[in-house]
Every structure is written in structure tokens, then in C-alpha cells.
Amino acid sequence: MKTKEKKDALSRLHIGGYGEAVMSRNFYSQSFNRYKKPENYANDHSHGRFDLPHVCLNFGYDFGQGWTMGSEIEFEHGGNGTAVEIEAEEAGEYEAEVEKGGEVNIEQFWINKEFWNGMFNIKAGEIIVPIGYSNVYHEPDQFFTVYRPEGEATIMPNTWHQVGISLWGRLKNWRYEAQLLSGLNSESFTAESFVHYGATSPYEFKVANNYAGALRIDNYSVMGLHIGLSGYYGYTFRNTLRTPGTKYDGLTGALGIIALDFSFNRWNWIIRGNVDYAHFSDADEISAYNQANWTHHRFQDGNPHHYSNIGSSAVAYAIEAGYNVFSQIPQMRQQNEQLFVFGRFEHYDTMASGTYESMYKYTKKYRCVFGLNYSPVKQITIKGEYSYRFFEKENNNGLTSDSPLYKQPYNNEPSVSLGITYCGKFL
């Protein structure tokens, strides 16, 4: 290959990525039973964590004539690892062990064809489902908190990606996108995470007995302001290898989601917000089905799905605002350094309505966050925050704590976190 051809090929290649390293200290119990009997865990010791929430590498290539390729490989929580060892204590038997928890995912892999200078595009492959703010803007420089915003990341898949077909484009100050996807799987829905795990598959393929559609429209007409409206609809029941009996013929598990989000970046302020609402039909019947069929055979274990109650609806809303105080210091402004002081409030509930709502009051969470984001250069941000997660107080109607009818309030959950992130293009 000639030198000129090599340079041309290299100019068509794009490499980038992002990553997060986090240290946190949680000043509340880490017991999985802390919501069942909160009085037993009120004085538990704090606990700390080190984590690599996301480390991603992006690769793209422009083939010419409007054809492009994009891919993203994501290592969640440092990836995973297994090893085979010979155990002396077990007569030299081979033993496979999980050396490290985590995940490795192909989060994106798509081919795109552009028409009419980007006014219309066709994209096919593993694509991001653009529902809500956090699925579209999931890089660490697009939110202030150390971890991704809790609300949307809890009630929906995040980052939500599936194999599908997308029609999208830009028209002046508008961007649109419509997608055809496989439906989610209601066997993976839970009380505490709603449909968060519904997009995953334990098999080597994604079952697509049901299909779903996603739509998003964005507007950029006002300088510094972006507004997005997105929606999703699809059936979720029977989207698995298992075939339910005829008594379930009328169930569809229809899932509808609507989300509104915005971001404002001007005058040294960044303000972001979102409102998300989801409704799930046949929640009671599918909850009963999941619990009655949590394993294929009474002597068989290892079912990858869940068998908890499911809410009929879920909700999440949030607002965050940050001001760049270095904008008022000439030397820092000239060096393009930034220091944002921010605050965030959010509420989310994975069991906002439904027959079992009273059993899962702890799913109704509120959270206040205050912190700093310091960027010495554009691609690197150091984050620090104090987070306070809390719950609605029980109405005990004047009962004292020694009464057998007294309902113990849930313990508040404060924490501090420190993180360092990078996000940018390398080539």
C-alpha cells in the first residue's frame, strides 16, 4: 500500500473511549435484608468499595460513499475472569473458579448508510436504544455524579443496547430516530429494578418472539438548550424459549415508556433534567407465572431469570445544576480548566403502582447529591460527591416504637464517592 493510501485509510479510522475509576464509602448496612427489618441494621458499620464501573473502547471506520461502521466494547466493573486449577485438597481434581466478577459486552456494532447529507440514515446492528437521557448521554462527562444517574439506570436497561434497525436523521434543528427491536423479556423483570434486566439474554442469541418499537425526537432550536422526547412500546410475555400453557393465551405484558429530558449549557451553567414514566400490563398475572415457573423442574437449578413480583408502573424524575466557578478566574479560564459545583435531586420508584405496592415501599427512593467536578483538560474529570438517599416516613398515627403495630422507618443511606474519568478520541 502506498504512503498516500495508508494516510487516507488512517484518516478514515476513529478510535476513542471513556472510563471511570471510583472509590466510595457507604455509611449504611450492605445487608440484602436491610429493608425487611430496618431496625436490625440501623447501627451497622460503614463499608467501602473500589470499582471500575465502565471502561469502553470505541472503533469506527468510514468506508466512503456514505457507509460507516461503529463499535464499542465495554468492560463493566473491570471485566470478568475464570481460571482452572488443580486442587491438592481434592485429590488433584480440576476445578473451575470465578476469579473476578464483572461483564464484557459488545455494546455497539453497527453499519450505517447515509443519504442526502445526513437527513436520512439507515443503521443496523447492535445499537443504543435512545429512551431517556442516560441511555443517549451515558459518557461520564455528560453527568455530574460519580456513578450514572440512579433513577433511569434503575427502572430501565442502562446502557440499553439491542440488535435492531434504526432510521434516523437531522433536519435543521431537529433530530429524529425510529427503531425496530426485539421485545424485552418479562421473566427478567423484578420488583426492585422493574424492566432493567429485560434486555439481557442468558443464551447465545436474543429471543425475538415479540418485537418492539422505539422513537426519539430532539430539538436544538434555542442556543444552548436541547430537549428530547422519547417513547417505547412492545410486548414482553412469551419472549423466551419456554412455552406457557394455554391459560396464559390472553397475556401480552405490553410495556410502554415515555420520557422527556433536557439539557442547558450556557452562561457557565449546565442544567439537566428528566421525567420518565413506564406502564406494564398484566403485571399481577405475569408475577404469578414467574413465581410458579421459576425453574423448569423441581430438581433443576440454575434458572437465569427472576421470580419476584412486578409493579404495574415505574417512575423517575431528576434535576441537576452546576456552575463553573473557574469561569470567574481569568487564569483558569485562559487555561480552559473547569470546576463545576453542582447539586442534584432525584426520585424514582420501581413499584409506583400495582397490587404489591404496599409490600415494597422501600422502592420509593429520594436522593440528594452535592459535589464538585474538576477538569484540568477537556478529556479528564475528577469527581467528588456526598450523596444522601432517603425514604418516605411511615405514618404511625402517633404510635410509639414499642407498639406491635409500629412500622419501623427505613434507614437513610448517606455515602461519599470520589472518581476520576476520561472521555475522548485518541485517533
Each language-model region and where it sits:
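Active-site glycine- and acidic-residue-rich loops that bind
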Residues: 158, 204-211, 250-254
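Outer-membrane beta-barrel pore domains
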Residues: 28-30, 42-44, 94-99, 109, ...
